[in-house]
């Protein structure tokens, strides 16, 4: 049987010094034979999705200790992408994913922890912790802080979120009163922003991967029901410890759960719910850590056969994550995918022997269990707060209308093709991605002249100065993982295009990435990126670009001879932006750029450069 990793520092006479230090943390004689379980928290007062996590690590710790474990909590960093958006702060967002993954590895391996509970929530924290968990391959349970309630204002019948506040602020016709009302109402509570943005997408995907409990992705941060998820996570991690260290059960380990089939299930869910394009980046990175063969080719194949069964903000103003929960949450969507024959249900999860078993219990359509139905009736209270578990409001009924409700059956799908697609062509030889769920069908095929910008800052200035005209393809380059560096999100350019009335009249193409709050014909992750010699670095103003989503194509309509000459010029220039950028790149960012791969590889480090 595997021995507790912690025995390295707790057993034997020569570890007297280490035990003395453990005792100084509160451990007693009877604790040294127990599993030491690390709790990776991510509390910070900078991020609304994490502001309520301060005491939740200790809530989990108490449960661990009640059932025979020793809990030791530590904290990671957490960057708020919304606050970092639109300025050089966004250069640090994606690199923070690697820092978080490394920090968790450092703490767990330095202290020989036996298992791990990951308390994550927002955009890069869940992916970073997921990468670490799969790298370490010790028992793990994820439990996130939960989604924010959607906002409301007397000036609108629609629910609000962060993107609404950004769009209205850039609308010159909106009054100061309206802008202020949206600003004060868009983000009313603690939690991850209320639409199907990156944070909520990733927390939903941990359910599909099998590494978190049902409800993790959709139970509101403010709702009392979420407390039970934290308590159950504490008890569950000790069970998983016993199964691995006491029984050598491989299904108790993350790599035994997050197999290729599980990654396919997670991506199937992502496509069906129209999740953020960032999830592709993060799943590719996680698959590499898990040593699972899962790449853009697999994602492309899935995108061609998986329908869109759920549509949530920013793809529609009608529904937010709280509405997905009311319709049965992640397992409501998985249930419909299962009935459509699109899931591999033999895979295990941290809470069930198989996904099939979990669906029997947690799918609201196939189960008539009153407790289950009550759980999914948990709803918003509409009271601004930063406190977790502070309300117990319930909807009067569930939304199980699979014809016209939030979640649809295959027969009533929003679209028979899913919400994400991979495009290839001479402009993106290694691929690029688009959230088709947010693209109006009238522009699924689009051709127009390029309007080229060498940075996000230049693009924002150009859009606000009315340089961009209807029918153009806005190209923002040298914003990839290496070229940015850091692969900035382009939420402000897309929001400003909307505010200028160009949301359905222009396309946007970048080697950077997009916020989960992005909609419109926004194509990101162009690979290779400009800084790595990608064709996007050769585009000039006026060049015609053709985008064909049904055919999964994206092409620069130029003769090869012209491209060859431009490539020669770019080689001589060292693949640098044509115009100087007033951007300070620190040594920390340079170190990230030195090893960064393009988006088709998940923007992970090129470990081949590190040697054996």
Curated annotation (Swiss-Prot):
Recorded family membership: Belongs to the IlvD/Edd family.
Enzyme class: lyase
InterPro entries: Dihydro-acid_dehy_C, DihydroxyA_deHydtase, DiOHA_6PGluconate_deHydtase_CS, ILV_EDD_C, ILV_EDD_N, IlvD/EDD_N
Binding site for [2Fe-2S] cluster: 122, 193
This protein's name: Dihydroxy-acid dehydratase
Binding positions (Mg(2+)): 81, 123-124, 489
Pfam families listed in its UniProt record: ILV_EDD_C (PF24877), ILVD_EDD_N (PF00920)
N6-carboxylysine found at: 124
Transmembrane segments annotated in the record for this chain: none
Coiled-coil intervals: none
EC number(s) on file: 4.2.1.9
Active site, UniProt feature: 515
Pathway: Amino-acid biosynthesis; L-isoleucine biosynthesis; L-isoleucine from 2-oxobutanoate: step 3/4; Amino-acid biosynthesis; L-valine biosynthesis; L-valine from pyruvate: step 3/4
Cofactor(s) needed for function: [2Fe-2S] cluster; Mg(2+)
Domain of life where this protein originates: Bacteria
Record key words, sorted: 2Fe-2S, Amino-acid biosynthesis, Branched-chain amino acid biosynthesis, Iron, Iron-sulfur, Lyase, Magnesium, Metal-binding
Cellular component GO terms, alphabetical: cytosol
Record's cofactor remark: Binds 1 [2Fe-2S] cluster per subunit. This cluster acts as a Lewis acid cofactor.
Biological processes annotated in GO: isoleucine biosynthetic process; L-valine biosynthetic process
Molecular function per GO: 2 iron, 2 sulfur cluster binding; dihydroxy-acid dehydratase activity; magnesium ion binding
Reaction(s) catalysed by this chain's protein: (2R)-2,3-dihydroxy-3-methylbutanoate = 3-methyl-2-oxobutanoate + H2O; (2R,3R)-2,3-dihydroxy-3-methylpentanoate = (S)-3-methyl-2-oxopentanoate + H2O
């Amino acid at each position: 049987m595997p021995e507790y990793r912690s025995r390295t520092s707790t057993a034997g006479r020569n570890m007297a010094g280490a035990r003395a230090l453990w005792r100084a943390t509160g451990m007693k004689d009877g604790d040294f034979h127990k599993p030491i379980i690390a709790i990776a928290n991510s509390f910070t007062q900078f991020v609304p999705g994490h502001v309520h996590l301060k005491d939740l690590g200790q809530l989990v710790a108490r449960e661990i200790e009640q059932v025979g474990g020793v809990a030791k909590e530590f904290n990671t960093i957490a960057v708020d992408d919304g606050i970092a958006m639109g300025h050089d702060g966004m250069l640090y967002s994606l690199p923070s994913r690697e820092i978080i993954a490394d920090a968790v590895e450092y703490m767990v391996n330095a202290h020989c922890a036996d298992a791990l509970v990951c308390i994550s929530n927002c955009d890069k924290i869940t992916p970073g912790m997921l990468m670490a968990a799969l790298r370490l391959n010790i028992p793990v349970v994820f439990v996130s802080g939960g989604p924010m309630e959607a906002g409301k204002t007397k000036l609108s019948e629609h629910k609000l979120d962060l993107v609404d506040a950004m769009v209205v602020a850039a609308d010159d016709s909106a009054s100061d009163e309206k802008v202020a009302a949206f600003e004060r109402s868009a983000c009313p509570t603690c939690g991850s922003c209320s639409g199907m943005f990156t944070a909520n997408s990733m927390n939903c995907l941990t359910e599909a991967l099998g590494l978190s409990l049902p409800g993790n992705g959709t139970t509101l941060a403010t709702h009392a029901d979420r407390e039970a998820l934290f308590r159950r996570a504490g008890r569950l991690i000790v069970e998983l410890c016993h199964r691995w260290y006491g029984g050598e059960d491989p299904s108790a380990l993350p790599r035994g759960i997050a197999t290729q089939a599980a990654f396919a299930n997670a991506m199937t869910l992502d496509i069906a719910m129209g999740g953020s394009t960032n999830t592709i980046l993060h799943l590719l990175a996680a698959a590499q850590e898990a040593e699972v063969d899962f790449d853009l080719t697999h994602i492309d194949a899935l995108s061609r056969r998986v329908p869109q069964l759920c549509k949530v903000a920013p793809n529609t103003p009608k529904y937010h994550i709280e509405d997905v929960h009311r319709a049965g949450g992640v397992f409501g969507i998985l249930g419909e995918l299962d009935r459509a024959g699109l899931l591999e249900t033999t895979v295990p999860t941290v809470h069930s022997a198989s996904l099939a078993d979990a669906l029997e219990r947690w799918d609201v359509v196939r189960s008539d269990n009153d407790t289950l139905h009550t759980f999914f009736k948990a709803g918003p209270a509409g009271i601004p707060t930063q406190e977790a578990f502070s309300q117990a409001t319930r909807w009067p009924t569930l939304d199980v209308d699979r014809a016209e409700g939030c979640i649809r059956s295959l027969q009533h799908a929003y679209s028979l093709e899913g919400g994400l697609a991979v495009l290839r062509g001479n402009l993106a030889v290694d691929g690029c991605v688009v959230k088709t769920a947010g693209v109006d069908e009238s522009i699924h095929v689009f051709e127009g002249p390029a309007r080229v910008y060498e940075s996000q800052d230049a693009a924002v200035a150009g859009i606000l100065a009315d340089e961009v005209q209807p029918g153009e393809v806005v190209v923002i380059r040298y914003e990839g993982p290496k070229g940015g560096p850091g692969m900035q999100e382009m939420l402000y350019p897309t929001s400003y295009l909307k505010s200028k009335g160009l949301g359905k009249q222009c396309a946007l193409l970048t080697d950077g990435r997009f916020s989960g709050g992005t909609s419109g014909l926004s194509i990101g992750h162009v690979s290779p990126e400009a800084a790595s010699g990608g064709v996007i670095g050769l585009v000039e103003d006026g060049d015609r670009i053709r985008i064909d989503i049904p055919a999964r194509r994206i092409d620069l309509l130029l003769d090869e001879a012209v491209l060859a000459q431009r490539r020669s010029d770019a080689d001589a220039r060292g693949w640098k932006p044509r115009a100087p950028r007033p951007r300070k790149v620190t040594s920390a960012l340079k170190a990230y750029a030195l090893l960064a791969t393009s988006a088709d590889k998940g923007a992970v480090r090129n470990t081949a450069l590190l040697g054996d």
